[in-house]
Amino acid sequence: MSTPHINANVGDFAETVLMPGDPLRAKYIAENFLDDAKQVTSVRNMLGFTGTYKGKPVSIMGSGMGIPSMSLYARELIVTFGVKNLIRIGTCGGIGSDVKIRDVIFAQGACTDSNVNRARVRGTDFAAIADFDLLLNGVNAAKDLGIKAKVGNVFTTDTFYQADDTFYKDLDKLGVLAVDMETAGLYGVAAEYGAKAMALFTVSDHVITGEATPADERQSTFNEMVKIALESI
């Protein structure tokens, strides 16, 4: 049975789905990391694939940009297709003073300027956090691969272009490591519908210092993050 946004059949998705924002990255991962990968959905060019990694079934599907896009795909994957584990993989902007471009970051929790999680619990702040087991498996996979990673709080925003850049300095004082646009929504959906979720990123640029990863170097650091995610399942 398909949904308005996913034209797959029940059983087409593995219990674990990796979710990059860009559907073309989903295609890249399927073609370069999975065995026997097949495309299972393509509505609005939001591509999804299922294959195996070291014999384990795994799916890859794009999430699009922002909490609304991530939330509708995550909900449909969980409710209609029986997905149990959702792992966001993507880039982020560094905030922390000790965060460098190319760093790998695990989002232990995600604060946000969106009201989406408040709406879930009648205006009450909801602590959007990663599933502990997925997080632990990810951190251990990074260690086994010899990849240093940071673990901590991130900030999920609805506004890509902030009017006041000093805002990020306030977040740095609170120990927030990085900014993205999806994680708080993903964690909220997973909590609401009884699934597990975790997000990890590579730092593509730093929103305070202005430092950025050259475009030709981004793929190699992205590959490291994908490897961590796949080894963690």
UniProtKB/Swiss-Prot annotation:
The record marks R218 as: Important for catalytic activity. The active site is at D205 (proton donor). GO terms for molecular function: purine-nucleoside phosphorylase activity. GO terms for cellular component: cytosol. Its EC number is 2.4.2.1. Keywords: Glycosyltransferase, Transferase. GO terms for biological process: purine nucleoside catabolic process. Transmembrane segments: none annotated. The keyword Signal does not apply. It comes from the Bacteria. A purine D-ribonucleoside binds at H5, D180, M181, E182, S204, D205. It catalyses: a purine D-ribonucleoside + phosphate = a purine nucleobase + alpha-D-ribose 1-phosphate; a purine 2'-deoxy-D-ribonucleoside + phosphate = a purine nucleobase + 2-deoxy-alpha-D-ribose 1-phosphate. PROSITE patterns: PNP_UDP_1. Phosphate binds at G21, R25, R44, R88, I89, G90, T91. Pfam families: PNP_UDP_1. Homohexamer; trimer of homodimers. Belongs to the PNP/UDP phosphorylase family. Catalyzes the reversible phosphorolytic breakdown of the N-glycosidic bond in the beta-(deoxy)ribonucleoside molecules, with the formation of the corresponding free purine bases and pentose-1-phosphate. This is Purine nucleoside phosphorylase DeoD-type.
